[in-house]
Swiss-Prot record:
It is found in: Cell inner membrane. One of its GO terms (cellular component) is plasma membrane. It comes from Campylobacter jejuni (strain RM1221). Its EC number is 7.1.1.-. It is an enzyme of class 7 (translocase). This is NADH-quinone oxidoreductase subunit I. Keywords: 4Fe-4S, Cell inner membrane, Cell membrane, Iron, Iron-sulfur, Membrane, Metal-binding, NAD, Quinone, Repeat, Translocase, Ubiquinone. GO terms for molecular function: 4 iron, 4 sulfur cluster binding; iron ion binding; NADH:ubiquinone reductase (non-electrogenic) activity; quinone binding. [4Fe-4S] cluster 1 binds at residues 83, 86, 89, 132.
């Protein structure tokens, strides 16, 4: 098979040094270059138009669904751990980086004794948070977890919400959490309607007493 080449007969090959320099200038200095320089100078001279931040003095506000280092949640009322030791997060982890050790307490219920995550191996896919039936493990917003070694483990006491900071814990709205309108998609029980009826009657009685006064 022969190779054919298209030859432009009108094209002149530069011979002298000046012709080579002239050709290089014509190819490099075009109108598009000045358009780009104009846009750059226009954005540079605008006030309060910075596209960057002064990290670490300033940090980007992360979205609720950002998946960073994990957190283990507690119940605010009882201060107990939400984790029931079902092991679903350990089973579904595609990076095989979650380890859990459980035992039975005096009531015969599972108790999580040790919980660890290899943060150097975790890919932060969010499967563990999505599969958790108790919303016990969620993804936080702590992304500054650089380490000097490849295997960087986080343990239960690192992820679990301290009791003294429990009042600051808020229901998580990120990966693995319920929708805000999740209650509308759940089938109600008869007790729910009885409670709603009692609440409506109490409100009605309160309004009538206020009008009589």
């Amino acid at each position: 098979m022969k190779n054919y080449y298209l030859v432009d007969e009108k094209r002149k090959t530069p011979v002298s040094t000046w012709e080579k320099i002239s050709q290089a200038l014509r190819r490099s200095v075009k109108l598009e270059l000045f358009v780009g320089l104009f846009v750059m100078m226009r954005e540079l001279l605008k006030r309060n138009n910075s596209a960057t931040i002064k990290y670490p003095f300033e940090k980007v506000k992360l979205d609720n669904r950002y998946r960073a280092v994990h957190r283990l949640m507690r119940f605010i009322e009882s201060e107990n751990e939400r984790c029931i030791g079902c092991g679903l997060c350990e089973k579904i982890c595609i990076s095989n980086c979650i380890r859990m050790e459980t035992s039975l307490d005096e009531n015969g219920r599972k108790k999580v004794g040790n919980y660890s995550i290899n943060l150097g191996r975790c890919i932060y896919c969010g499967f563990c948070a999505e599969v958790c039936p108790e919303l016990a493990i969620v993804h936080g917003t702590e992304y500054e977890n650089a380490a000097e070694q490849r295997s960087y483990f986080g343990y239960k006491q690192d992820f679990l919400t301290p009791i003294d900071k429990l009042k600051n814990q808020v229901e998580f709205e990120g990966a693995g959490s319920l929708r805000k309108d999740a209650n509308l998609w759940v089938k109600k029980t008869p007790n729910y309607y009885d409670a709603m009826l009692e609440s409506a009657l109490e409100n009605q009685n309160t309004q009538e007493q206020g009008e009589n006064k």
